[in-house]
Amino acid sequence: MFLLVQNPGVAPVEGFTLLGVSTTRDCGVEGAIGQFGSGNKHAINVLLRAGLKIIVYCGKTRLDFQTRDDEIDDGLIRKPVKRVMCKLGGTSTRTIDLGWVLDFGAIDWTELGMSLREFVSNAIDRTLRQENGEFIPAMLDGRLAVVPVCDEKVKAKDGYTRVYVELNAGVQRYVDDLPK
């Protein structure tokens, strides 16, 4: 099972893979939240540290996040690190080294709810921008959605951004606490 966070409109792949990219900052839409270009990246790391699978579809492009063991040598010690990687599928098949390690954000991005709130906030931001400052109609008709889905429902939807987070007890608690 996965939690699906879906919004109309296709986020750029770089919004999940390039630190500092924010399409919401200075967008001119009242109520938009995002601005720093780091939230998605921190959210991905929280989930990877928790051992949860995350799959993102930016339209038809699939993003699978994983880590690769590496070692940093500063001349005094050799420190093992886990580099965060993104394997693309669909419209591209390359693997991107994202340029940060799993410990990025580990001191202050510590809870599953923080990562889930980030994805939901980004979905609302995009919907606000896509729908001329309104998100309630998209929520009511299902274009903007935060719902559990079974594994076989994990797939792309043209014209949409879809974030799938592996469902565990912590993710389910977050879903249960959402306003109905």
Name the predicted role of every residue range.
Residues M1-K180:
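GHKL (Bergerat-fold) ATPase N-terminal catalytic module, capturing the glycine-rich phosphate-binding loop
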